């Protein structure tokens, strides 16, 4: 697989976000061209080399063996609302035209989270769905208190994702609250996510294609984890987001929108405007392969020489785990 791809030719891009997502202010990564098409290598900075190896496996999957045929031509998508002001949250919901919002919580004061949720509910209306992602910020007692308050502020939550860091803490929270609980980071951190049974810990699993090593490996996780699965993404361009859509398109429909609306958080993209994965009426299309990068846009959003060197080292380390 390594010999089919010229990794040295992979361009490095850096697209500023319109709004920070936690500590992330820039969408950075490499575009990997395989014999059949392009993939994206954009592991978060927190990933170790082994985890980055999974992201690289995912990046070269579509350009070498391709993705499985989808069951659906489009999937419902949730708009991501980071830690922003209530007015900004309301605007983001209105612009996205989605029927589900995934609201980041736990990073700041609970009062700010509550105000943001109330604004999101006001913008969405009473019949739309709201979920929260706490990114493991809470301990058990804080999670229990916060979830009850957030559920009231939202007028009902669809679920809360990753309230605490460990599965044991999450299981304890789940027993003490009435809101369904989802896990994602626990899957990413596992040495072998395909062998992780989750039914005793959570109600839902959130799968990220890059973190799990590609669409096919993610499908195997969905088959073995024992609970319903939906799909999410990190800060990725439309090329990377296409992998999440490919997975969502082959999984059984469990009635939850996938958190794949991240292109709206980008100040630009590496694909042409018509190919950028911006939600329309709450849905995104499932395609057999990602859109090809636009050379002009790749040049416009090219990373600095220092970041290019960093990503080259990152890629070399990840290749050891292919």
Model regions and ranges:
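N-terminal capping/lid subdomain adjacent to the active-site entrance of alpha/beta enzymes
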Residues: 1-131, 135-153, 272-322
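Glycine-enriched alpha-helix->loop->beta-strand junction motifs that scaffold or abut catalytic
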Residues: 96-99, 124-126, 148-157, 174-182, ...
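Residue-level detector of flexible, active-site-proximal loop/helix-junction positions
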Residues: 17-19, 188, 236
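Conserved beta-strand termini and adjacent loop/short-helix elements that scaffold enzyme active sites
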Residues: 15, 80, 184, 232, ...
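Active-site-adjacent beta->alpha loops and helix N-cap segments on the catalytic face
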Residues: 107-123, 138-142, 163-175, 190-192, ...
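Shared catalytic-loop signature of beta/alpha-barrel
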Residues: 59, 192-297
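Catalytic beta/alpha-barrel core
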Residues: 101-109, 129-136, 154-167, 179-189, ...
């Amino acid at each position: 697989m390594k010999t089919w791809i010229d990794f040295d030719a992979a361009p490095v891009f850096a697209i500023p976000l319109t709004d920070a997502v936690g500590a992330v202010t820039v969408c950075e990564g490499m575009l990997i061209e395989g014999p059949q098409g392009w993939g994206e290598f954009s592991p978060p900075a927190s990933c170790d080399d082994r985890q980055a190896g999974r992201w690289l496996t995912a990046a070269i999957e579509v350009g070498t063996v391709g993705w499985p045929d989808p069951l659906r031509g489009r999937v419902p998508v949730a708009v991501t609302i980071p830690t922003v002001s209530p007015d900004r949250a309301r605007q983001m919901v209105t612009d996205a035209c989605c029927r589900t919002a995934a609201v980041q919580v736990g990073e700041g004061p609970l009062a700010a989270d509550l105000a943001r949720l109330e604004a999101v509910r006001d913008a969405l209306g009473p019949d739309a769905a709201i979920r929260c992602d706490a990114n493991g910020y809470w301990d058990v007692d804080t999670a229990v208190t916060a979830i009850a308050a957030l559920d009231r502020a939202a007028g009902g939550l669809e679920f809360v994702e990753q309230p605490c860091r460990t599965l044991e803490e999450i299981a304890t929270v789940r027993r003490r609250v009435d809101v369904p609980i989802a896990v994602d980071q626990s899957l990413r951190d596992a040495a072998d996510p395909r062998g992780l049974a989750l039914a005793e810990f959570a109600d839902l699993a959130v799968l990220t294609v890059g973190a799990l090593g590609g669409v096919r490996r993610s499908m195997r996780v969905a088959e073995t984890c024992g609970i319903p699965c939906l799909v999410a993404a990190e800060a990725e361009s439309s090329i990377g987001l296409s992998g999440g859509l490919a997975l969502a398109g082959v999984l059984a429909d469990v009635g939850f929108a996938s958190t794949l609306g991240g292109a709206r958080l980008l100040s630009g993209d590496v694909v042409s405007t018509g190919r950028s994965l911006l939600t329309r009426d709450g849905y995104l299309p499932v395609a057999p392969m990602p859109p090809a990068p636009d050379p002009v846009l790749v040049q416009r959003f090219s990373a600095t020489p220092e970041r290019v060197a960093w990503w080259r080292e990152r890629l070399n380390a990840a290749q050891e785990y292919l």
